[in-house]
Amino acid sequence: MRMSTKDPKVFFITPPFTQLNTPYPATAYLKGFLNTKGIAAYQADLGLEVILQLFSTNGLKNLFAHIENSSKKLNENGQRMLRLKQSYIRTIDPVISFLHDKNPTLAHVIAEQNYLPEASRFQQVSDLEWAFGSMGVRDKARHLATLYLEDISDLIIDAVDPHFGFSRYAERLGRSASSFQELNRALHAPLTYIDELLVKTLEAKILQEKPDLVAITAPFPGNLYSALRCGQWIKKHHPEIKVAFGGGYANTELRSLQEPRVFEFVDFITLDDGETPLINLLEHLKGTRELKDLKRTFCCIDGTVTYLNGSKDPDVKQKDVGIPDYTDLPLDKYLSVIEIANPMHRLWSDGRWNKLTLAHGCYWGKCTFCDISLSYIKDYEATTAPMLVDRIEAMIAQTGNNGFHFVDEAAPPALMRDVALEIIRRDLTVVWWTNIRFEKSFTKDLCQLLVRSGCIAVSGGLEVASDRLLELIDKGVTVAQVAEVADHFTQAGILVHAYLMYGFPTQTAQETVDSLEVVRQLVENGVMHSGFWHQFALTAHSPVGLNPDAYQIQILNPEPGSFANNDLEHADPTGTDHALFSEGLKKSLFNYMHGIGLDMPLQDWFDFKIPRTQIPKNYIKRILAPSAEQMPKPNAKIVWLGPVPTIGKSSRGKTILQMSMGRDEVELLVPEKLGSWLVVTLDQLAVGPGKTWIFEEFEKEYAKAGLGEFAVFWEGATVEELREMGLLVI
């Protein structure tokens, strides 16, 4: 064991590829935590750096030269692109600069469609004026520039490297890799074209930083191969450096690891939250902790994979994890792209979002398809709103960016409410979106509060859009509830994305078709803006995987492999042939998101006979019909987000309350005594440093003022107008 009096220097790596528009947050989270311990760390997004090298003038010159010198036979599209190579080489640097938001005037020539070379991706371009409007020049140009990059990506996949993808690399090798054999074979093959760029970039960083420990995060199967390539290079060329591996892939797939060959590429593999395992590992490298006393860490001892968990140190509480630190990452070099012309869908690829977690784990933690037995779901721990907003302020100061994506499994409504109040209380400008459950806590008023604090969008699981299956999933919601909550968000001006699932055990063809009809009606009624269908995947750590008999399925690969063990093959004898529906579901939704085909028969999306839907044509419309509101609960919070009113003219026992709203001057005619009471009371209800009132107090103050029957007042026109202006019960 190396003995040293100083802390080892850490180098965090995100390997290719994750997102083009914003950093994956794992390394920033861990760097922020190490800051609290005074430990030096450096981080790099090697995926971004490889992309920027590849998509540059020199990068394309080298790429086209490589293609011309190879014996690979190109398809017709590739041959066209080769003929247009000078146009690609000439335009690539200006386009990348435009996607960095540094060359905005280029939008005008891109949008005219006579500047960029066009290959097969542009065949999908239809009515861009309809999609972006006559004034949406920059967005239209960003979409066209994205298609241009995707054309080049297609050429790379066809002619150079079939593993390439903008947000993943060699993903197939990481999926369901119960055996390490194929991945090991690929890692011992000569470096690919992309590998060459990767290791060149990695080597420069290693020589620059001279770390003692390289910690590689692999959140997804599409990062695994590159992560191990990085480890392989380091261990071969810099054997004095230790390599640790962790992240989402290890947490879900490698919990029963027995494969010693993986330790040719890394020295340590850690599971679950990384803070304490990392600190313990650094103590070990420093010589102050025995190997056996590491936390949730695999290593290879005498040729045998050994799980080390002798540490008595607890996991770090959320209040102590520190502030995510994006230092070292070139935040101005990320590429904002628009893959499809949909305002909600673009959030995943357009804009630089600071990532932050409101609460660790999932407060619901019951969904039967989910890995609820694993720490990242089951160990729920919230942070306080003031501390979260302290972190928001610090990250805005650090990055110069006020856009946030709260990356919770499902953000808790009560905490969202408190964070929104704290943002408003501090008078901050924040733009944010997050993942939610469509639960009844999201009332109209709460959604209005969220939008006032800067919320622009939410994403959540509708999953199977069938009440029987939602109950089987233990989702805790119904289709009607999802529709109502989505409507509340939409009425407030918040975009809604739904995660959709097909192929859950026992799902019939009829239920699949009915789910599609529900989705069609949600889009048609304007309460769902985008969605994504994925086929149910059985995992070993989910309730379904742990108890398959209860869901009438048969596991086909029950014996665990030596490497990855999470995805399970299964047979669903009582369900339909789920794979048959895949193309039709995805094709219909893609069109619905563009406002196309909403009046087409469902049968038209499929090339085989499907059952007629049993969902009434007005099913969602009926659910969304207005209904009488209940009197608020006594302990509900009540706040005023509008301006403090002033008293205008008074005559004949009536007075005019005047308020300057953002766009309008509003006058409210009320009884004189009520007007005086409202001026004082609304000021006290305003979100500020004082305590927040509850509804019971509001009612008592009204009664104390002797203003008449409260129910009549609350259900009357005055309160109706005040609620539209910002009197919210939350």
Regions found by a protein language model. Name each.
Residues 2-15, 35-36, 50-168, 187, ...:
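Radical SAM enzyme core and accessory elements
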Residues 8-18, 26, 46-51, 55, ...:
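A structural motif corresponding to the C-terminal lobe/cap of the Radical SAM core domain
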Residues 9, 17-20, 25-59, 70, ...:
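Glycine-rich beta-alpha loop elements in corrinoid/cobalamin-binding modules
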Residues 13, 44, 217, 244-246, ...:
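Generic beta-strand/beta-sheet core signal
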Residues 18-21, 50-51, 221-225, 251-253, ...:
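Flexible loop/turn segments at secondary-structure boundaries
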Residues 207, 261-262, 396-397, 451, ...:
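Non-catalytic positions within long, well-ordered alpha-helices that form the structural scaffold/packing
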Residues 324-492:
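Radical SAM [4Fe-4S] cluster-binding motif and immediate context
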